[in-house]
């Protein structure tokens, strides 16, 4: 999302009640999975003077280094605004993709040695596309990448975003080489489509993408349906207003369709950044529909959007990071046509949850922030039976504060000062 340079700011492992476009777990995460040993944090140097880096945090509860940063991998770029990584670790032997938004760079890391990952290469977007954002791993190991922009002017008169053309998608091989690409341009949308995130339905040769901005002034509030086999754009669906149970419309509730997930019945459920929830059905036909099925009331945020960010799905539960409410909200999506809120967990008002990832070997969830709180990450625990979430108070920084702190001067790579973290993944 739109972010200040210093306060930055798919495919998840989902239990049996919900399907997913996620790849299988890494080969070294066995069916009798144990809690992850490490956490990878994609971090930026706060003052932008030193290199951004991938940090390795020891998260073994019985380790003398529990909660400590044990390794860092500088990427040789400062001020890149480290943003998204893949949402699930790739299979063993494959490289982990991560993006640095400001420099339009995608970094590929070898993570075979869990404690000592290494940067293998850095790649630029394939012309004419600009600003890579999200990644979705295919079964063959290739990676789909969404691009927010393309070369040229915005199709919207008066939009000064430059370059400002419609975004697009590309398929890259395991090494980051271009296989194919396609534009998200649609004559039905005069507002630029900013490809944000993916939901994959390979069994019916379909995928869905959302549209949301980072630093762009304008972005179409639409979702798009594609044929996976040839990247043919089939439909562009406007996102309808977000309504509360009494029928009243939440202003901006439909804004910035954000993160989609495939449900067990084949439908796609997605949250808008404005905290409306939408179900897309009929992807396999020419009669696909999108309906507002739930809305989290974030009107206390005023005219700003509620900042519903990255979800995780645990069985029948959708756990939603809601930045403006400083909360994790759990929805029961066993019936995706009728989500029901079951619990809320509050953080302090300075921490605005945005990113989440689940440890496939335990009930731990790492929670990162956006637009407030990026100087730390918090650990949460989920009850898979009830969907209730609690804070893990065993993980504390050197000053005793809960979570992992990036407020420090020394790192394994040197005395470079404070950092911020955005994305994180558990490493078995």
Locate the predicted segments by residue:
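Structural signature of eukaryotic scaffold interfaces centered on beta-propeller domains
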Residues: 27-35, 84-92, 135-139, 150, ...
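Asp-box/WD-like beta-propeller blade repeats and closely related beta-sheet repeat scaffolds
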Residues: 111, 116-202
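Beta-propeller domains
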Residues: 191-328
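Beta-propeller blade signature
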Residues: 55-59, 160-176, 220-230, 379-384
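Blade-loop segments of beta-propeller domains
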Residues: 67-137
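Surface-exposed loop and turn segments in beta-propeller and other repeat-based domains
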Residues: 69-83, 122-128, 180-194, 235-253, ...
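Short, conserved, GDST-rich strand-edge loop motifs in beta-rich repeat architectures
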Residues: 34, 41-48, 145-165, 209-222, ...
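Loop/turn-rich, solvent-exposed surfaces of beta-rich toroidal or solenoidal domains
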Residues: 302-384
């Amino acid at each position: 999302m739109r972010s200040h340079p210093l306060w930055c700011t798919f495919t998840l492992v989902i239990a049996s009640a919900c399907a997913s476009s996620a790849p299988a777990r890494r080969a070294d995460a066995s069916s009798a999975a144990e809690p992850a040993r490490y956490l990878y944090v994609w971090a930026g140097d706060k003052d932008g003077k030193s290199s951004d880096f991938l940090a390795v945090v020891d998260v073994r509860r019985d380790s003398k280094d529990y909660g400590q940063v044990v390794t860092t991998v500088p990427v040789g770029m400062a001020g890149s605004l480290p943003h998204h990584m893949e949402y699930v670790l790739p299979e063993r032997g494959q490289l982990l993709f991560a993006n640095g938004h400001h420099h339009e760079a995608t970094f590929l890391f070898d993570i075979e040695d869990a404690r000592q990952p290494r940067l293998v290469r850095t790649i630029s977007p394939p012309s004419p596309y600009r600003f890579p954002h999200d990644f979705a791993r295919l079964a063959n190991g290739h990676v789909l990448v969404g691009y927010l922009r393309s070369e040229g002017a915005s199709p919207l008169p008066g939009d000064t975003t430059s370059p400002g053309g419609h975004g697009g998608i590309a398929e890259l091989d395991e090494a980051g080489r271009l296989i194919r690409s396609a534009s998200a341009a649609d004559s039905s949308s005069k507002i630029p489509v900013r490809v944000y995130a993916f939901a994959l339905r390979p069994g019916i040769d379909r995928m869905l993408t959302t549209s949301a901005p980072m630093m762009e002034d304008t972005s179409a509030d639409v979702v798009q349906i594609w044929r996976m086999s040839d990247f043919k754009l089939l439909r562009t669906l406007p996102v309808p207003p977000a309504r509360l149970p009494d029928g009243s419309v939440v202003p901006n509730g439909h804004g910035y369709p954000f993160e989609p997930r495939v449900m067990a019945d084949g439908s796609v459920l997605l949250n808008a950044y404005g905290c409306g929830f939408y179900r897309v059905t009929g992807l396999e036909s020419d009669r696909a529909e999108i309906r507002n099925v739930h809305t989290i009331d974030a009107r206390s945020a005023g005219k700003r959007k509620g900042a519903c960010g990255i979800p995780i799905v645990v069985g029948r539960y959708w756990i939603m990071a809601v930045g403006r409410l400083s909360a994790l909200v759990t929805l029961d999506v066993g019936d995706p046509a009728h989500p029901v809120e079951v619990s809320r967990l509050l953080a302090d008002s300075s921490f605005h949850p945005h990113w989440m990832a689940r440890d496939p070997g335990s009930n731990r969830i790492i929670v990162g922030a956006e637009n407030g709180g990026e100087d730390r990450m918090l650990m949460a625990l989920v009850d898979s039976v009830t969907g209730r979430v609690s804070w893990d108070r065993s993980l504390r920084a050197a000053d005793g504060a809960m979570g992992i702190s990036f407020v420090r001067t020394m790192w394994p790579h040197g005395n470079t000062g404070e950092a911020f973290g955005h994305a994180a993944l558990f490493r078995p």
